[in-house]
Amino acid sequence: MKTKVFGIGFHKTATTSLAKALSYLGYRVTGPNWVDNPNIAEEVYEMAFELANRFDAFQDNPWPILYKELDRKFPSSKFILTLRASDEWIRSVVNHFSEKEMPMREWIYGVGHPKGNEDVYIARYERHNREVLEYFKDRSEQLLVLNITAGEGWTKLCPFLGEHIPSVGFPRANTASEREKLRKRESFWPRRMYITFRRRAKRLMTSSIAR
């Protein structure tokens, strides 16, 4: 049985890349796991502990907020704090979430969306990272700090987990360049369908006139 691994870095710190890496190593991964009820605290712990009994690895919301409770309930677990520079992080958060309100984010930050609330989000992000480091300061065998966006990957992750280093590259998922490619693909097909429709309509009109 795999040791439980909790990713406790905030979203937009390469949590999806971490999930793909853990999955490649054979872990059963879950997250993000959302609760849409505005009274989120009433449901999140029950949901999290139920999932914790079914999976090996966990990332994104709500796991970063629950690390103390998870440590007490699963004392032999390992924790991974993914992070990145605060200015890079907030740009990514704003680009991704903008003004979209979510109960989960309101529970974490006190306000439901980052746009216009950048200082609030950065303060919460930096406080979380400081508190995690303080909490695990005498237990380095249980906490790995990993900056995937700066190029860290298998060579830090695998020794920490006691896994062999794979010969494949470390996964890089949900990057800005990937999202831009997806946006272009999604915008390409409506244009293509419109052009095809116009051409067919023009041929039909020409055919009708010829008759």
Which residues make up each language-model segment?
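PAPS-dependent sulfotransferase catalytic core
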Residues: M1-R54, L204, R211
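Short His-Asn-centered micro-motif
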Residues: I8-G9, N33, Q59-W63, L83-R84, ...
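Short alpha-helical
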Residues: T13, I65, D87-E88, E152
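PAPS-dependent sulfotransferase catalytic domain
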Residues: S23-Y27, E43-Y45, F49-A52, K68-T149, W154-P159, E163
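Hydrophobic/aromatic beta-strand patches that form the interior of the parallel beta-sheet core
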Residues: T30, K78-I80, L144-L146
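The conserved 3'-phosphoadenosine-5'-phosphosulfate
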Residues: N33-E43, S86, E134-D138, Q142-T196, ...
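Conserved nucleotide-sensing/catalytic segment adjacent to the nucleotide-binding pocket
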Residues: Y45-S77
